[in-house]
C-alpha cells in the first residue's frame, strides 16, 4: 500500500461504532458542541484522534506504527436531551497510550490539546472509566478512611473542621491561638486556608510551630486526638517537601495541599511521602471552578475527583449541597460516592457515565465546607453520612462569644444529630426540632442558633449558563 498524502476525514479512521471496548481501555465521555455544519461523527472522531495518535493530515510515519493498536476510537454517540446541537461522544483509549502511575500524563493526553480544536465550539469531559489494570499502577490516597479513623480513634460520626479566618493577615501567634480555641472547644481539625502559604505577615515555619503547640495543648486538655491541616503548598516541589518534612518532625498528624494549583506531579510526590511517613493528606480544590463550572466546556468535577483519588489525598473538598457554594444534590452525591466507595455502578441520574471499580485504592473523605452553620447540621449529617468532614469556618469563628464557644456549638449540634439519627428519627423532617432541643442544654448552641436563625444562601443553579 503506497503512502497517500493529503487531508482526510477523521471519521474514516477514528469513528468505529462496531468497536467492542476492552476491559483495559480508558473510556471517556465528552459533551461535544460542534461548529455548525460539522457532523457529530466527524466531531467525535476528531476528539478521539487529537487526544491520541492523530494529527491534521496523514503523515508518512503513520506507516511505521500500528494505528489499530494505538489509536483512540469514538465508539458511540448519543444526543443530549433538551440540547439541539450537543451530544455525548464516547471514546476508548488503549492503555498503552499512558504512562503508569501518572495522572499528569493521563490528563495531558486526554484533555491536553483537543479543547482548543477549531471544529468544536465547546467540549467538556464529563466522566472517565479508569480500568483496573491502570488503577493498580497508582498508590492512591496515603491512608484512606479506615486508617484515618484508627489513627484518630474517632468512629461513628462525621469529623468536624474549621478554616481559620481572617485567612490572610494574622500573625503566627494569633493564628495559633485561634487554632487552639477551636480545637479546645471540640473540633477535630482546623485548617489553613488554601492561600495561606508563606507570606510576609506569617512565614510557614512560624505558623507550623504555633499550630503544633495549639494541637498538643488542646490534645492534653481534651483527651482527644487533634489536627491542623498545615498547608505545605509552595512555589517549588522541593520547598513543598521541606514543609512536609518539618511537619513530620513536629509530629503533627496531617498536612495539606492545593492539588490543582500545585499540580498533579507535586501532589503525587507529596502523597507518596505522606504514606511513607504516616502523615494524613488534606486536599483543597482551589481553581476547580475555572475548570468545572461551565456546563458546556471544561471538565466535570467528578473527573478531577477521580484523578485525585489516583494521585492521592485523604480528604478533598466536595461542595456542600446546602451552603454558599453550588452543587446539585444527586450529582454531588454521585462524586462523593466515587471518592468513598470501592465500586460504583453506572447511574446517569447521578452523572455517573461508567461503572467504576477502584480495586484496592483506599477511599477519600469528602469535605463539606462553604457557608454552613449549625442549622445545616441535620441536612449535612443526613446527606453526607458518617464518612465525611464537615467544615465550618465562619460558622465557628462567627459565634458571638468567640471561637471556642463556636466550636462547642458545632460539636453539640453534631452529637445531637448523630444521636437522633441512631435513635431512628428522620433528620430531614425533624432537623430543626432536634437542634432546638439540644440548644436547651447548651447555651453556646442557643447563641449560635440565634445568630444564624434565618440565613439561607439560595440562588438559581449556575449550571444553566
Curated annotation (Swiss-Prot):
Signal sequence interval, chain numbering: none
Site residues, Transition state stabilizer: 324
Binding site for Mg(2+): 191, 193-194
Residues found modified as N6,N6,N6-trimethyllysine: 4
A GO cellular-component term linked to this record: chloroplast
Active-site annotation: 165 (proton acceptor), 284 (proton acceptor)
Post-translational modification, as annotated: The disulfide bond which can form in the large chain dimeric partners within the hexadecamer appears to be associated with oxidative stress and protein turnover.
EC number: 4.1.1.39
Modified-residue entries (N6-carboxylysine), positions: 191
GO BP term, example: reductive pentose-phosphate cycle
Enzyme class: lyase
Cited Pfam families: RuBisCO_large (PF00016), RuBisCO_large_N (PF02788)
A GO molecular-function descriptor: monooxygenase activity
Compartments (UniProt record): Plastid, Chloroplast
Function: RuBisCO catalyzes two reactions: the carboxylation of D-ribulose 1,5-bisphosphate, the primary event in carbon dioxide fixation, as well as the oxidative fragmentation of the pentose substrate in the photorespiration process. Both reactions occur simultaneously and in competition at the same active site.
Record's subunit section: Heterohexadecamer of 8 large chains and 8 small chains; disulfide-linked. The disulfide link is formed within the large subunit homodimers.
Other observations noted: The basic functional RuBisCO is composed of a large chain homodimer in a 'head-to-tail' conformation. In form I RuBisCO this homodimer is arranged in a barrel-like tetramer with the small subunits forming a tetrameric 'cap' on each end of the 'barrel'.
UniProt cross-references to HAMAP family, sorted A to Z: RuBisCO_L_type1 (MF_01338)
Name of this protein: Ribulose bisphosphate carboxylase large chain
Native organism: Morus rubra (Red mulberry)
Biological classification of the source: Eukaryota, Viridiplantae, Streptophyta, Embryophyta, Tracheophyta
Amino acid at each position: 500500500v503506497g503512502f497517500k498524502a493529503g487531508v482526510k476525514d477523521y471519521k474514516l479512521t477514528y469513528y468505529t461504532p462496531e468497536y467492542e471496548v476492552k476491559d483495559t481501555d480508558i473510556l471517556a465521555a465528552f459533551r461535544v458542541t460542534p461548529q455548525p455544519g460539522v457532523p457529530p461523527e466527524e466531531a467525535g472522531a476528531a476528539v478521539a484522534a487529537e487526544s491520541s495518535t492523530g494529527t491534521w493530515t496523514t503523515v508518512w510515519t503513520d506507516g511505521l506504527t500500528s494505528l489499530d493498536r494505538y489509536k483512540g476510537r469514538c465508539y458511540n454517540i448519543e444526543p443530549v436531551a433538551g440540547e439541539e446541537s450537543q451530544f455525548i461522544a464516547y471514546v476508548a483509549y488503549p492503555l498503552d497510550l499512558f504512562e503508569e502511575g501518572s495522572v499528569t500524563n493521563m490528563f495531558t493526553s486526554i484533555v491536553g490539546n483537543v479543547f482548543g480544536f477549531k471544529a468544536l465550539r465547546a467540549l467538556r469531559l464529563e466522566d472517565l472509566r479508569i480500568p483496573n489494570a491502570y488503577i493498580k499502577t497508582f498508590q492512591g490516597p496515603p491512608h484512606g478512611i479506615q486508617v484515618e479513623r484508627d489513627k484518630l480513634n474517632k468512629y461513628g460520626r462525621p469529623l468536624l473542621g474549621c478554616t481559620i479566618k481572617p485567612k490572610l493577615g494574622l500573625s503566627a501567634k494569633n493564628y495559633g491561638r485561634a487554632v487552639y480555641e477551636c480545637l479546645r472547644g471540640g473540633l477535630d481539625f482546623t485548617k489553613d486556608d488554601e492561600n495561606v502559604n508563606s507570606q510576609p505577615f506569617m512565614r510557614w515555619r512560624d505558623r507550623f510551630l504555633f499550630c503544633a503547640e495549639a494541637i498538643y495543648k488542646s490534645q492534653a486538655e481534651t483527651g482527644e486526638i487533634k489536627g491542623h491541616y498545615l498547608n505545605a503548598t509552595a512555589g517549588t516541589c522541593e520547598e513543598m517537601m521541606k514543609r512536609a518534612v518539618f511537619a513530620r518532625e513536629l509530629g503533627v498528624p496531617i498536612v495539606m495541599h492545593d492539588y490543582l494549583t500545585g499540580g498533579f506531579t507535586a501532589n503525587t510526590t507529596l502523597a507518596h511521602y505522606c504514606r511513607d511517613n504516616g502523615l494524613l493528606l488534606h486536599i483543597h480544590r482551589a481553581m476547580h471552578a475555572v475548570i468545572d463550572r461551565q456546563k458546556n466546556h471544561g471538565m466535570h468535577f467528578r473527573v478531577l475527583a477521580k484523578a485525585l483519588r489516583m494521585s492521592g489525598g485523604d480528604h478533598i473538598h466536595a461542595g456542600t449541597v446546602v451552603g454558599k457554594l453550588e452543587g446539585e444534590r444527586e450529582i454531588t452525591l454521585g462524586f462523593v460516592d466515587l471518592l468513598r466507595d470501592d465500586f460504583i455502578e453506572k447511574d446517569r441520574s447521578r452523572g455517573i457515565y461508567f461503572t467504576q471499580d477502584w480495586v484496592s485504592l483506599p477511599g477519600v473523605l469528602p469535605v463539606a465546607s462553604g457557608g454552613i452553620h449549625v442549622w445545616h447540621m441535620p441536612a449535612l449529617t443526613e446527606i453526607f453520612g458518617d464518612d465525611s468532614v464537615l467544615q465550618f469556618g465562619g460558622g465557628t469563628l462567627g459565634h458571638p462569644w468567640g471561637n471556642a464557644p463556636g466550636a462547642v456549638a458545632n460539636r453539640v449540634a453534631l452529637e445531637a444529630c448523630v444521636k437522633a439519627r441512631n435513635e431512628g428519627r428522620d433528620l430531614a423532617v425533624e432537623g430543626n426540632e432536634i437542634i432546638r432541643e439540644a440548644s436547651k442544654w447548651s447555651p453556646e448552641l442557643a447563641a449560635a442558633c440565634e445568630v444564624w436563625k434565618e440565613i439561607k444562601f439560595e440562588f438559581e443553579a449556575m449550571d444553566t449558563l
